[in-house]
Structure formats: structure tokens, C-alpha cells
Design a protein with these regions (language model features):
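Acetyl-CoA-dependent GNAT
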Residues: 2-75, 86-88, 92, 96, ...
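Short glycine/proline-centered loop/turn elements that form peptide/ligand docking sites
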Residues: 86, 109-112, 129-134
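Conserved hydrophobic beta-strand within the GNAT/NAT acetyltransferase core sheet
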Residues: 67, 101-105
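Conserved acetyl-CoA-binding loop-helix of GNAT-fold acetyltransferases
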Residues: 78-92, 114-118
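Conserved catalytic-core motifs of GNAT/GCN5-like acyltransferases
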Residues: 104, 117, 122-138
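Residue-level recognition of the GNAT/N-acetyltransferase active site
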Residues: 7, 73, 77, 104-108, ...
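Terminal substrate-recognition subdomain of acyl/acetyltransferases
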Residues: 137-145
Length: 145
């Protein structure tokens, strides 16, 4: 598996994973493509045998980064790809002198919360009813570096 910066060749696959994982809340292919020209954005993909297995997207403003999306397609889950993507993102962010990475996660998504805790994230807040379908709170997690 290789982790690299997303390019135009990856956009359709990333959009398909978005739809698979997030349904009607998914980013469109046009929105994903727009991130290629967003100077604040950094998106990485995990590629296995020519197939995009997963991705992570972020946006950095004033040395603080928000993780926008992370997802792994069903065929590649439970193989540590999400962990590798977030770890690679943190390393890339350190190189551009970002000081922190913040994300939101569903309060019910305990597997993701366990991964983020393992990677050194701590809970810093809660956004009531942040998610729709179903309505649910988001936990705000942050990692300083």
C-alpha cells in the first residue's frame, strides 16, 4: 500500500468512497475535485494494487488543521488503513508547521474514537445535534504537535 497526495486521477474513486461511506451526506465529485486547487487543503489517498482504498482530507488555516473527511472502502476495512492515513496526515502537517489537528466524530462511533485516542487525540468539546440522519452529537477531538 502506498499513501500519496490526492491528484486528479484519484478524484472519482474518492467521490465513490464518499458516497459508499456517507450516502446523501457525501461530497460530490465536483467538490472533491475542487480540493485539488484549494491552497488550504491537503488530501491523501491510500492506494493498493492501483485501487484507492481510502482517503483523508484536511484544511489548514493559521497553522491549525481541521480534518474534513476520512474513509476506507468496505473491501479494505479492518486492515489499519485509516490509522496509516491519519498518521501520514499528521506527518505531512508537521512538515508544513501546522500545530494541531482537530476533527469531529459521531458520539456513537466508538471504533473511530478508539482509533483517535490511540493516535493521541483528546476530547476538547461537543457539538450538540451536529450530525443529521440520524441526529447525533459530534465529539470534537484534537491532537497537538
Amino acid at each position: 500500500m502506498e499513501i500519496m497526495r490526492m491528484n486528479a486521477d484519484h478524484v472519482a474513486s474518492v467521490a465513490a468512497i464518499e458516497k459508499e461511506c456517507f450516502g446523501r451526506d457525501a461530497w460530490s465529485e465536483k467538490s472533491v475535485s475542487g480540493e485539488l486547487t484549494n491552497a488550504l487543503a491537503l488530501w491523501l489517498v491510500a492506494v493498493e494494487g492501483g485501487t484507492v482504498a481510502g482517503y483523508v482530507g484536511s484544511q489548514t488555516v493559521c497553522n491549525e488543521t481541521d480534518m474534513m473527511n476520512v474513509a476506507v472502502t468496505a473491501d479494505f476495512r479492518r486492515q489499519g488503513i485509516g490509522e496509516k492515513l491519519v498518521t501520514a496526515l499528521v506527518e505531512e502537517l508537521k512538515a508544513i508547521e501546522s500545530h494541531s489537528l482537530t476533527l469531529e466524530v459521531r458520539a456513537s462511533n466508538t471504533p473511530a474514537q478508539a482509533l483517535y485516542e490511540k493516535l493521541g487525540f483528546t476530547e476538547v468539546g461537543r457539538r450538540p445535534r451536529y450530525y443529521q440522519n440520524p441526529k447525533e452529537d459530534a465529539l470534537i477531538l484534537r491532537k497537538e504537535f
